[in-house]
Amino acid sequence: MFSPMALRPRCAKWLIVTGLFLMLGACVEKPSTLERVKEDGVLRVVTRNSPATYFQDRNGETGFEYELVKRFADDLGVELKIETADNLDDLFDQLGQPKGPVLAAAGLVSSEQRKQQVRFSHPYLEVTPQVIYRNGRSRPTTAQDLVGKHIMVLKGSTHAEQLAELKLKYPGIEYEESDAVEVVDLLRMVDEGQIDLTLVDSNELAMNQVYFPNVRVAFDLGDARSQSWAVAAGDDNSLLNEINSFLDKVEKNGTLQRLKDRYYGHVDVLGYVGAYTFAQHLQQRLPKYEKHFKASAKQEKLDWRLLAAVGYQESMWQAEVTSKTGVRGLMMLTQNTAQAMGVSNRLDPKQSISGGAKYLAYIKEQLDDKIEEPDRTWFALAAYNVGTGHLDDARKLAEKEGLNPNKWLDVKKMLPRLSQKQWYSKTRYGYARGGEPVHFVANIRRYYDILTWVTQPQLEGDQVAEGNLHVPGVNKTKPPEENPPL
């Protein structure tokens, strides 16, 4: 016979057991953000698609932010997965979404408004906000001069925040925020006169100004600010703490400085006249020799754009030139080098380019195995200019000074010492104009950057047509010089 009284002890037991399971479940902690990243084996990062942050060229993914965050992923022992945001609002929206990016590495500047959305890491790069105008037009020099100008900035940027604050003091300031453009587009619009002014950070201008010969800095809008990575405001501290430890480490061991040098250590070497002249020659001279650069580079397993950059540095792509020291031709080969590389006529552009390619490839092959890319390329270029003997002397000086003889950032500091008696008197190969290879390499790196940029359609959108290289500003009349470059 069923008895309700007999059921009570059973129910009590079940309630106790169920309660214990619930308590045990509550005691199991949710894995931290860092633990989830390591368990998944993937670091999901959101960034911007721009030359200063992340882009893809024929060699794959690249960019300052990409290289830095790739090192962080490698440090964690996980795969890096990059997502690109359509605009800044999209970037912040993606951050922290379920199964979405856990980190934003996009050259972000911290601000009080942004701190309501995200938390920022330790800083890793200092930049200055700059007002940009077109050469030949009236140059603004103060915030009040922004009144009445057609200004456009990135929507959701700290530059928009700055303009909003200025508008409180100068109500006549009007500006447009756009989520359909990137920094490159804003600079192009100033260059072509579509807008009067824009605001960009100094690092992005430095990387892009050479492509836009007409743009100038009007004035700095405020003090320098720091760029940082960002994580979602609601996340725990685990990933942010790991990021900060990583950034502190790469700052101390020199990795961060070498990365800065790779991307920003050569960007200001051309100046206005050099940039404009190179842009002209890119269209007028390069087409005559492009097939030879490509063929010789393929033969020697080099990047044809690097080889072309060397040719421009040597002769400005002129085939029949002779220097006062006797080097001749498009690649400015010495008689001995020409003979060694099988060049019978140094003034024949095809032979000259072939000889230069063989010589550069030969130098790269002879370098110390401890020198890795990209430093290996910069060392080879320096040796192409000053000779392997003097380069070895500079490496030994670097080692004596406690620097790394296998890093271009360190060795380029030693090369100028080869022209100072107190230093070259202690070397095997003696005096050299050691400053020349430093400038030689810096110029070639800049020319190479431009050649890479204009041969990548995705970087310039519809401006670059297949087989028809375009450099902004090239087809325009040379702008007036009454406003000197800053």
Curated annotation (Swiss-Prot):
It holds the Pfam family SBP_bac_3. Residues 464-486 are annotated as: Disordered. Its EC number is 4.2.2.n1. The active site is at E314. It is found in: Cell outer membrane. It is a peripheral membrane protein. It catalyses: Exolytic cleavage of the (1->4)-beta-glycosidic linkage between N-acetylmuramic acid (MurNAc) and N-acetylglucosamine (GlcNAc) residues in peptidoglycan, from either the reducing or the non-reducing ends of the peptidoglycan chains, with concomitant formation of a 1,6-anhydrobond in the MurNAc residue. GO terms for cellular component: cell outer membrane. The N-terminal domain does not have lytic activity and probably modulates enzymatic activity. The C-terminal domain is the catalytic active domain. Murein-degrading enzyme that degrades murein glycan strands and insoluble, high-molecular weight murein sacculi, with the concomitant formation of a 1,6-anhydromuramoyl product. Lytic transglycosylases (LTs) play an integral role in the metabolism of the peptidoglycan (PG) sacculus. Their lytic action creates space within the PG sacculus to allow for its expansion as well as for the insertion of various structures such as secretion systems and flagella. This is Membrane-bound lytic murein transglycosylase F. The lineage of its organism: Bacteria, Pseudomonadati, Pseudomonadota, Gammaproteobacteria, Pseudomonadales.
